[in-house]
Regions:
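Surface-exposed, interaction-prone regions used to assemble/regulate multi-protein complexes
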Residues: 1-132
Length: 132
């Protein structure tokens, strides 16, 4: 079951902060909408994802995928960390090991990041927060 799904827009990695263990995946403003769609992923341990997604759907990974990722790539599953699957519109599936993620709409400039900020309530609208 998808936690987040937007298969009609292009998303790309915009920023990564190893000191904050965060990654920002953004769908930039377009002629069809005047806001970015930012996906801020926190507590990032491992990533096996491309830099650009043609559409994006985020779910919790299947049990069969988790075993392979734990054994081959050192992914961790604890009460805090989970394995997310990221699927593009072509059906290709990628994986990310992290704690949680949030989806925001904002009007930040293309070079302006939304990770590592302390003014989260001021920079955009929180659409979804997943930390279950």
């Amino acid at each position: 079951m998808a936690i987040f799904s937007d298969l009609s827009n292009e998303f790309q990695i915009i920023d990564y902060s190893p000191t904050h263990n965060q990654i920002l995946i953004r769908s930039l403003k377009s002629k069809n909408r005047d806001y970015n769609i930012d996906i801020i992923i926190k507590g990032v341990l491992s990533i096996l994802i491309p830099s650009i997604f043609k559409g994006l759907e985020i779910s919790i990974a299947e049990i069969s995928d988790k075993k392979y990722l734990i054994e081959d790539y050192g992914f961790k599953i604890t009460k805090d960390y989970r394995v997310f699957s990221l699927k593009d519109s072509t059906g290709k599936v990628y994986f990310l090991n992290a704690m949680c993620f949030g989806v925001y709409h904002n009007k930040l400039d293309i070079l302006e990041t939304s990770i590592g900020r302390y003014d989260m309530e001021n920079f955009g609208e929180n659409i979804l927060w997943y930390a279950d």
